[in-house]
């Protein structure tokens, strides 16, 4: 999800002048990694693969035109664009104003640094306008306690109900439904799980 959101931020920043995006991550290293993906995607807009198709060539030409019109100035924590748009990464981003905010791994932050988690909500999230977008994606670290769990539980209770522009819309993408994570079971012996994992999946 975070790579998709990073590419969406790049797209919105290129085609909307003065559009400000923020990436809040559990560590600055993780946040700057996402900035690196955005920078790589921008640099690759005019990439032509070996044995290109007509579509490849057309996309590369479009990318060349975009890069000619809108230049990017990347740094470790920020990508600034010549159209006034900007993408910034940090661990709380308090004091900034964003139209699009991605909060990654709030479960981890809430479990290990609850005061910083509260600051993310009261500072960065509350500074996003009501017509802005906040994407909050996280594992379930911390279990059934902490700020992330409270927010997730509240959004789960709203599933199927009318939502205002200020309500969270809940999406769940379970990792165990990804075929890449399946183990091949032996027909003769099957596959068994330790008791703690069985309890995890039952919860």
Predicted regions and their residues:
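Phosphate/NTP-binding elements of NTP-utilizing enzymes
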Residues: 1-203
């Amino acid at each position: 999800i975070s790579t998709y959101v990073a590419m969406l931020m790049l797209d919105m920043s290129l085609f909307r002048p003065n559009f400000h995006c923020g990436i809040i991550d559990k560590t600055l290293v993780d946040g700057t990694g996402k900035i690196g993906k955005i920078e790589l995607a921008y640099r690759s807009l005019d990439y032509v693969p070996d044995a290109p198709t007509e579509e490849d060539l057309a996309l590369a030409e479009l990318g060349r035109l975009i890069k000619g019109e809108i230049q990017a100035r990347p740094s470790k924590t920020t990508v600034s664009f010549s159209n006034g748009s900007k993408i910034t990464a940090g661990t709380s981003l308090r004091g900034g104003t964003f139209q699009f905010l991605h909060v990654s791994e709030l479960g981890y932050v809430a479990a290990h640094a609850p005061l910083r988690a509260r600051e993310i909500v009261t500072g960065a999230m509350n500074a996003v306008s009501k017509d802005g977008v906040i994407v909050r994606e996280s594992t379930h670290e911390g279990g059934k306690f902490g700020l992330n769990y409270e927010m997730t539980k509240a959004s789960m209770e709203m599933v199927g109900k009318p939502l205002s522009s200020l309500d969270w819309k809940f999406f769940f993408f379970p990792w165990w439904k990804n075929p890449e994570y399946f183990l091949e079971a032996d027909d003769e012996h099957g596959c068994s799980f330790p008791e703690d994992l069985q309890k995890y999946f039952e919860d």
